[in-house]
Amino acid sequence: MHAESRAVAARPQNLTAPAVRRLILADFRSYPALDLALDAHMIVLTGENGAGKTNVLEALSLFSPGRGLRRAELAECARIRGSGGFAISVEIEGSRGRVQLGAGLEPPDGGEPQARRFRIDRAPAPSARALADHLRLVWQTPGMDQLFTGPAGERRRFLDRLVLAVDPDHGTRVNGLERALRNRNRLLEEGAADRRWLEAAEHEVAELAVTVAAARRDTVSRLVALISAERQQDSLFPFAEIALTGDIEALVAGMPALAAEDRYRAMLAENRGRDAAAGRTLIGPHTSDLVVRHGPKGLEARQCSTGEQKALLTGLVLAHAHLVAAASGIVPIVLLDEIAAHFDPLRRAALFDELVGLGGQVWMTGADDAAFAELTDRAQILRVTPGRISRGN
């Protein structure tokens, strides 16, 4: 069956597919000011390296919880020689009609910390979490190309991004766990005289750790089920076999949450001496790993060729986009940076079909106009030059 037909057949019928119809930037990265009207579900940004294509995708990514696709400090997003702050506005067309969403960073005000701001129809919103009722986003960037061969921490961050797109509160819990672990490590380093301080810290660590591990495990389990139902041996984007490894994940899998918390608290207490000597907590979700294998070949992803890894990652991102749609009822906007650069024409054509079949808005960037030639009748193709975007040829 054709990729588009498979995707449509598998998609629940009550989904909404929000699309950006207008994008306004002020003092964001290389853009002093930009007001862009959009009329397609597939948007292609072409231009030379350094022209500002990725900056546009990054601006969109800041409407999701977290630090965006570059994981940059927000102050870095402000235009050099600008006010020190920035503003992003999008007009979204969805099931509720049109809604205007805003995100930005206030300019510096003396010694006060800069505040990140969000708005819905010009009214203040408490956080990016509030925007999740209007849009979801997933992305793939060249910075993810070393995911399978790099350190486990990169795969944990990737997994947490997958969870965050389904559960917008996950990032708050992960940040809370990191703070709780730092607090425990500090108490161990200082040799806390009152053990009740350590017990309180370990209680918080255990509670958050089990919650984080359970959310990761749930997302992986759902993704495994989706991939298993949809996988095809001969797909140009091979299916991934994924598994989550870690001591806390094993506890969560084998017992109720409260029992897992009790057991992990006991492990923390037993390992205080060892952790103090190491200067860090040695057991916890912060040491887990996401194991990925090339399904058709049965090889660990890190053993595959560079091209196979790229295709495997793209297949995983596409599967995750389907999971987000099924879990939230909102087809995510997909951001793909330099996605076509390393794919041959056959695989590019297959990718475009898969993206159309997903049913949501897709943004792609690339330096080579020819890579998107077959999309002339299906996409809005825009030409990016420094600080400016215009209609392509």
Predicted regions and their residues:
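Conserved NTPase motor "head" modules and their coupling/switch loops across ABC/AAA+ ATPases, GTPases
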Residues: 1-48, 62, 197-333, 342-346, ...
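Conserved P-loop NTP-binding catalytic core
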Residues: 2-9, 36-113, 169-170, 192, ...
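Hydrophobic "anchor" residues on beta-strands that sit immediately upstream
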Residues: 35, 117, 137, 333-334
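Nucleotide-state sensing region of NTPase/ATPase domains
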Residues: 65-154, 160-170, 225-229, 260, ...
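Structural recognition of the conserved hydrophobic beta-strand(s) that form the central parallel beta-sheet
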Residues: 90, 361-367
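An accessory alpha-helical subdomain
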Residues: 144-236, 245-248
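Walker B catalytic acidic pair
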Residues: 337-339
